[in-house]
Design a protein with these regions (language model features):
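Non-catalytic, topology-defining segments of multipass membrane proteins
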Residues: 1-205, 209, 253-306
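Pore-loop/selectivity-filter region of tetrameric P-loop cation channels
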Residues: 53, 88, 131, 236-247
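Active-site-proximal inter-transmembrane loops
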Residues: 143-150, 216-244, 251
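Intrinsically disordered, low-complexity coil segments
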Residues: 174-186, 212-230
């Protein structure tokens, strides 16, 4: 059952609560200097980092923002839940802001992520520090707001990371999952806080590291888009393919950001495997004319300042 009865503006939390939580989450990472580290804790943190990046790159970004593939309502909710567990807020909130980013990308101050119109701090994180930025205008994502479970998850997204934090501590403290009992603090610091913060910073880096920076030895600009985006092959693995940002802005509806075989897009690879299993389907391909355009390209400089 879907519904159109949701109020247009949804407030998930106060700005004060968000600021307090952001400070706590980042300060908690300093715990790495005070807790023991085992190989199991470290590798679990690494694995969960990639799960978190996949949750927002495949889920919040390619599916909820751009509808680049189809899936069942059940798996749709799983993607939304994973994104919430990763500290990426609700997927409706994520999609409304990201769609606005594409609409005004690097051509208007309405693109809150653009370092061309705002400071690096504002584009990276500062844009979040207003109540308006934290609220969700459900009218900007009516295709998602018709699902009551997504609207509910969007409002109460912060409860799920809290539950995961408690569960992580209990597993580390009272079981030998990480190699011994009594590792609750280590598990929380490394597999929850550090892993989460790094995955969040990876998302923020797309705004400040791949917009408005001239092409260089690890950045290139294949398409002459109106925005100031580049691709960064060096970040392909850490961001699971999302670093081919200029490609993405050339054709944002594609299920893949690495348009060519040599552009490693691990998110697309996982989606392809899921499509073979019929968990997802109808992955949107890159149009042939766009591929041909890219093959002929000798690279482009950034456009002039608007």
């Amino acid at each position: 059952m879907t519904t159109d009865a949701s109020p247009p503006l949804q407030r998930a939390e106060s700005l004060r609560a968000f600021k307090i939580r952001a400070v706590i989450v980042h300060l908690a990472c300093l715990g790495v200097f005070f807790v023991p580290l085992t190989s199991t804790v470290l590798w679990t943190a690494v694995a969960l980092y990639f799960v978190r990046v996949f949750s927002w790159e495949a889920g919040s970004h390619r599916y909820f923002s751009h509808r680049s593939f189809k899936t069942s309502r059940t798996f749709q909710f799983i993607l939304a839940l994973l994104a919430a567990l990763s500290g990426q807020r609700g997927v409706i909130w994520w999609a409304t802001h990201h769609r606005a980013h594409h609409k005004y990308s690097d051509v208007s101050p309405l693109d809150q992520h653009s370092p061309r119109f705002h400071s690096l701090w504002h584009a990276h994180f500062g844009w979040l520090l207003s109540q308006r930025a934290l609220d969700t205008d459900l009218t900007q994502a009516r295709d998602l707001a018709r699902f009551p479970e997504l609207v509910w998850l969007n409002k109460y997204h912060y409860l799920f990371p809290l539950g995961l934090l408690i569960a992580t501590f209990c597993v580390g403290q009272y079981t030998a999952f990480f190699g011994a009992t009594g590792l609750g603090a280590s598990a929380v610091v490394w597999t929850f806080f550090v892993s989460m913060v790094l995955s969040q910073q990876a998302a923020f880096l797309l705004n400040t590291g791949l917009h408005g920076v001239e092409p260089g030895w690890f950045r290139y600009r294949r398409f002459a888009t109106q925005d100031a985006t580049t691709n960064a092959w060096l970040l392909a693995i850490p961001i699971l393919g999302g670093a081919f940002h200029n490609n993405h802005h050339r054709y944002m509806n594609s299920a893949r950001s690495g348009f060519y075989w040599y552009e490693l897009d691990l998110t697309y690879l996982v989606l392809k495997i899921l499509s073979w299993l019929r968990v997802v389907w109808d992955l949107v391909p890159v149009p042939q004319d766009v591929l041909d355009e890219g093959r002929k390209s000798k690279g482009h400089a950034l456009p002039g300042n608007p």
